[in-house]
């Protein structure tokens, strides 16, 4: 053994060939700060071996290196810029030493090589991969850019266009594509990986392969003519501006850095990468996006822990077909859980099956499946008008009309048709689970399972724990949701649960703005372009359905009369009374017509102004900041109340529910991350300017207490990571 560290070791393999093996404690290798330091120490030993002929890098895990240790990132971002820059110089000196070894080097890459793992293998001369390879640089998705030489080496290896596509989009690619673009030099079966790697190294050692020529382009300026460079970078910047926009600075910074570094050799290019990386690491966007990643891991880990002793349902059922029922049935069948879809009439069943078939055909058109797979999946959805087969199902979700009487009747009837241990769930969006459970003989086997529309796209499923819901019931529904590829988040029962409970105060803020003379078009524009929502409130209401929102608004007002009971007729009432229900009938705040692809396209409709004038004061202008404040304060206050009341268990789960369920702008990181970025004291000052607007603008007492001491809601890291140089 030449060297033994905590996460890697160095040893002789055969005949002058050494192997550097990544073998961290635990299930995966990560390129954390300690591993970078250990790699430097291993190279120091290696550089003293005069009989060294070649070096093989490999992993003892199922994946090569899954990336940097993202749990270090938030504390790493606290490191002062000068110190962080120094550490990056050190880290890059380690990878440069690997690249500069006077012998051929090869990385035998199995499974994942992402982020720092990818940058590590880019420093070797050859890369041999297994068929399960996923390799790429996802850093821009975390608000940063490659910092270990990825933005320097990848363009010089692949050419500007392929490298820009991977780096700017934060992409990873599979083995076949990596081989095609030159990111790896060969693909071999896992059992032949080491044998093949040694064979390549031997050819390099004997001179049959020119490893020096392979290495040289990575040390030189990017080989592009002025015209080629202008075309590549102009197109890349245009694409990034269109897709990422101003709220996500990392992709554009990465493209501009690669462009600026193109005319330099390795050392100066790495300096430019360093100068770009460090400021990005200190942005609110980076903290927010890394926070989302960590929150996502926390939420999924919690779901896994809750279901560790639970068997995933093998047979499911959906009550109520139509678009929603068909979407749920499709998602279950697509992910391998056969489903019975029951309704009381053929028309609805046909609609549900048509929806499932439409979604499967889209997969076929995209080349994700073939006709055989399509037929196999659709055959596991069984439409029925009766309860045949319900004695074999493990879990049933009810998705009938949002009417408590109807839901109670359907659930009570179904309970008599299933086994005693079968779990029942309701896809209600606002009706308290306790109310629906009152119709059941076994309320402990019942909970809420709130899907978001469209089911196949929206990641979130709210799992609502009723007062009598058992832990096993909750775990079974979590297991099914996870199997369906969803992110389940458990919330406690109340009107609207979590997501809709905090959404309707946001809509109330919108209604008050319109009442006071705001133009809904400007509000939509500000909330989309400035704050970053995918849809402004008027557009969102049209998509949800004005009739649906009108009904839900009444449910919320009954549940929280002190805050959500209206004292005036608002814009939603006016549109509802005029039968303008949104996209579903082509008229809402906006007018909708089908585009060439059959999708609804919004257009202005002057008639709506006369309608809204009856519930609004004369038009007046509001600043962007005032619109954002008046829209967001009611939502943020309600989110805080939900945490204080135990409706949602943690800030992490609240933020992920809003990002995955409502499309809360990821660069803000969620409601609590946004609140902490503002600072609780600053937020309180802002909210107090609008408290005259009513109870929705009154800051909860718990948040007031934190504001007095300017305390964060998300626990704040006090210590930056200790960097080893």
Curated annotation (Swiss-Prot):
Binding-site residues, NAD(+): 324, 343, 400-402, 407, 429, 453
Alphabetical UniProt keywords: Fatty acid metabolism, Isomerase, Lipid degradation, Lipid metabolism, Lyase, Multifunctional enzyme, NAD, Oxidoreductase
InterPro entries recorded: 3-OHacyl-CoA_DH_CS (IPR006180), 3-OHacyl-CoA_DH_NAD-bd (IPR006176), 3HC_DH_C (IPR006108), 6-PGluconate_DH-like_C_sf (IPR008927), ClpP/crotonase-like_dom_sf (IPR029045), Enoyl-CoA_hyd/isom_CS (IPR018376), Enoyl-CoA_hydra/iso (IPR001753), FA_oxidation_alpha_subunit (IPR050136)
Catalytic activity field: a (3S)-3-hydroxyacyl-CoA + NAD(+) = a 3-oxoacyl-CoA + NADH + H(+); a (3S)-3-hydroxyacyl-CoA = a (2E)-enoyl-CoA + H2O; a 4-saturated-(3S)-3-hydroxyacyl-CoA = a (3E)-enoyl-CoA + H2O; (3S)-3-hydroxybutanoyl-CoA = (3R)-3-hydroxybutanoyl-CoA
GO molecular function, one term: NAD+ binding
HAMAP family found in the cross-reference section: FadB
Subunit structure and binding partners: Heterotetramer of two alpha chains (FadB) and two beta chains (FadA).
Record function comment: Involved in the aerobic and anaerobic degradation of long-chain fatty acids via beta-oxidation cycle. Catalyzes the formation of 3-oxoacyl-CoA from enoyl-CoA via L-3-hydroxyacyl-CoA. It can also use D-3-hydroxyacyl-CoA and cis-3-enoyl-CoA as substrate.
Protein name as it appears in the record: Fatty acid oxidation complex subunit alpha
Species whose genome carries this gene: Salmonella paratyphi A (strain AKU_12601)
Gene it is expressed from: fadB
